[in-house]
């Protein structure tokens, strides 16, 4: 079995890649990743168009998730569509981070095949589907199915230079469910302990395959019950097991700076794989220069305004903010490819150009 990369291996890998200025990606035509990747709704033309826009505005990286349910039902077809997607990203000079699992079932449904429900009016990411699904995560007798999926996808693409890094598991233990524009609830708290064990097992399966790309799982508990920042057991394990450190933070620049300074002590490259919450003072003008100064790759949430409705704020923000509709929460481009804010896109292009010549 392969082992965790050394600090020097991780740093050497990082120096071989441009500073990542990217986004979390679903095309505007997909309400969730199941719809994005199923054969009947895989929209290569829209993906091609949107990645062209992203390149033109200066982006060079993206992060996207894969659905276990589609692999299990249509393994060969999914692998071909992944190859098509990677070809399109390479065409537009965009590095790809693939995420294999995800607990963010904000719809409240277990994942299902076929036509997906339409977005619910006014609700942020209303049909988000997990991978493989919270019920399977909480049933270890089903984990051999997950292991087969992890091993197969990694084996198929373990030497593919179009993939720069694997994110094995997005937000393990996330229990959120969005009920309405201003109301949410949570799934069974027991999910967290199962997700922790599954994440640790997944690192083992992935190391056994031994991909040429590094492995990561993002620490994500910034403000969470009685745990300190990134001190939930899931975060501690993720930070200790990852080849490249990654994390999520939707807070203001002062909080972002504190996290960056803390993670720098680990002597590994750092990626912020989720950020951007304009209503919460997590915006471009302060934070993108901060990521650039720390040489921390960053992936904001969302590219084009679409069926995920992630320009609409989280339920908590909708409930408490005095003017929640005054800003977009996530996302940067209209469905016609025009920027929500021209200055944001000027900053993306300027900083990626600046960093390109300083590695």
Region locations from a protein language model:
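Active-site mouth of glycoside hydrolases
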Residues: 1-242, 248, 253-255, 266, ...
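Conserved catalytic-core segment of NTP-binding enzymes
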Residues: 259
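Aromatic- and carboxylate-lined catalytic core of secreted/periplasmic carbohydrate-active enzymes
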Residues: 3-4, 294-359
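Short active-site alpha-helical segment characteristic of glycosyltransferases
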Residues: 287
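Short, acidic, metal-binding catalytic loop of nucleotide-sugar glycosyltransferases
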Residues: 290
